[in-house]
């Protein structure tokens, strides 16, 4: 098992160059679009990349934490309000796959993963999750030997390129001369130490991921005892090791220009007989980390040679392989039935708890009873129509300027072919009409009712007279439009004024929070009459509250269903059930389901989809639960 370490190091320079040539725009966007606390998970050598990513991410003012897969199991309370990112070279070890499944059940905001092997089991897992963003790279060097080498350099390079704050990262290895000089230093150092020495690795700042990696490599390849500490924590008692065990101890000092002064001051106070090796770089920030990582590999290679051990193939005992492949999931898996798990995650969404056990006994009883009553009532009801929101419900963010998701179309045509009514309640206008006409056969158009501009206007899909933009524009909306257009915002904003609605959009969605509060403040200072602010998954709508209500579509659908000889009750599905979400009225009805945000009310607007299944995927799940009878539709949980 393994590969010669020296052969692995020969490929490092090309691997680094390769990593900087890869496209990382999508990776950067996925990580930074929704800046929440970030929990980063990795095992073995990949954990070093996790610590590097912590430093990169925290440059943007948000906390991050690197943990192992087992740590994740004991950290479930923090996952729901965080983003999660998995780092794995192969994407197939038991630990990473089990922890990924655990994270899915905790419903983090985003579930990201990055892997150096396409079509891995990790990638296949991610394809089942609505909130997942998976990034596969095809590392030219293939799998590493026993220790993480080229995959680790590739992770460092890709992550640095994606997240470097200055976005001007250029790494040029100096190289041979620089590395040869360092090799000479290591030879001198190993003349002073022996295999039974303890290595005290001191670090700070961008050196920290390298300290983590040195501890990992020296322990995994059995090259030496390692103690790691930052320069100042070393002064809080850890220095005592040198006093009692200094004869068999040495120091490995990781130094960038930022640590040089603190290192010099520290070592002036230590016994002069203590051997010290400086692994040093003249680079700062992410570049400094990468330079130190490569030099640390040279140190590991030299340490192995001094002991007659090849770090890339040190020899692994049988029990080591058994430990690596240990099947331990049953220890941590709960035996709850699928229905119980679904009930608990639905209650967590409603109650805003981090985990179910955060609720008191009284709260658990209250919400369990509410869930049982809601689902029982839902499954007893008989429907003649289904009313859907558009954006975030049947049209995902990736298609927000185009058509609805193709996966949902067969479910809609099934509903229509069974003779029932489909309602679409949207904040948009004619673009939705076009999308529906493009997707659904014309013979079904008379069964489709559209509520345009948050249902200010309602008409059939085959009606060419709606929406009518010739209607008189509300004066209050016109005044707000003029105010916002004249204001100097820090990013580009687009405004579309309609008779009873002003739609506000921003091209770069990740910058929305920079202007959202300013827009609301300006509108509220105007103190307009009958004006309300609503938000969808892709825009903000300022509406004339006196004529706009998404429930305006309900009576149209009921009448159409009755005319077809169907029951007149409606099933409502949307994504923004909590005000200012633009479905808060639509999902206030008793038989209403959310595919994302829920309201706090216990008798409506439940999200009962599986963990981490949301938006269009959740809509598809709900539609798959429909059972069609001659004159009504039943909803059956599965």
Features from the language model and the residues they span:
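Conserved acidic, metal-coordinating active-site core of Asp-based
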Residues: 487-571, 576-586, 590
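Active-site phosphate-binding/coordination module
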Residues: 128, 403-498
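Asp-based phosphoryl-transfer active-site loop
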Residues: 379-402, 583
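Mg2+-dependent phosphoryl-transfer enzymes with acidic/Ser/Thr/Gly-rich catalytic loops
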Residues: 340-368, 381, 553-638
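Catalytic-core regions built around general acid/base machinery
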Residues: 30-33, 99-103, 189, 403-419
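Active-site phosphate/pyrophosphate-binding segments
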Residues: 2-36, 130-248, 321-341
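Glycine-rich phosphate-binding loops that contact phosphosugars or nucleotide phosphates
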Residues: 25, 31-176, 204, 245-282
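Phosphate-moiety recognition in structured ligand-binding domains
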Residues: 2-11, 113, 128-130, 247-346
